[in-house]
């Protein structure tokens, strides 16, 4: 049996940590590449591998949600968006995507709640909120009492 010195063991551990850290980044970048090339099954596999090494990577969950949106699997899309928001509560793209799902489901209360949250955090996609609220006002039942 080989005895390792503490120094050798420490180097071995650091190398493995280094490989895991940069390996997961490699999985994400490869997934992004596949996503841009519209190779969604391969992209999904890479994002899932990235999550194994980095379970708190909200962007991988967001891209999985985008893939499930394309595949029209709303249940998995919504699950990944919720996970994205658990990790990164101010992710405006995830909030916006959830608003669109809630609008499709005619869940007006959820759309309004998400819209309020969205207006507090939006930086890039602020105009999208206005469009959704306009759609909501066109669909929402009028009170004719």
Q: At which residue positions do the language-model features occur?
A:
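Register position in tetratricopeptide repeats
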Residues: 36-37, 70-71, 104, 135-142
């Amino acid at each position: 049996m080989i005895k390792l010195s503490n120094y050798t063991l420490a180097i071995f551990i650091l190398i493995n940590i280094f490989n895991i850290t940069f390996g997961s980044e490699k999985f994400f970048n490869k997934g992004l590449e596949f996503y841009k090339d519209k190779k969604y099954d391969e992209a999904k596999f890479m994002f899932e591998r990235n999550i194994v090494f980095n379970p708190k990577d909200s962007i991988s969950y967001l891209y999985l949600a985008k893939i499930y949106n394309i595949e029209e699997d709303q249940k998995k899309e919504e699950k990944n968006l919720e996970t994205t928001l658990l990790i990164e509560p101010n992710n405006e793209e995830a909030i916006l995507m959830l608003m669109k799902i809630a609008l499709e489901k005619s869940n007006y209360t959820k759309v309004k709640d998400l819209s309020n949250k969205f207006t507090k955090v939006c930086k890039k996609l602020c105009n999208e909120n206005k469009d959704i609220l306009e759609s909501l006002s066109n669909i929402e039942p009028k009170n004719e009492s």
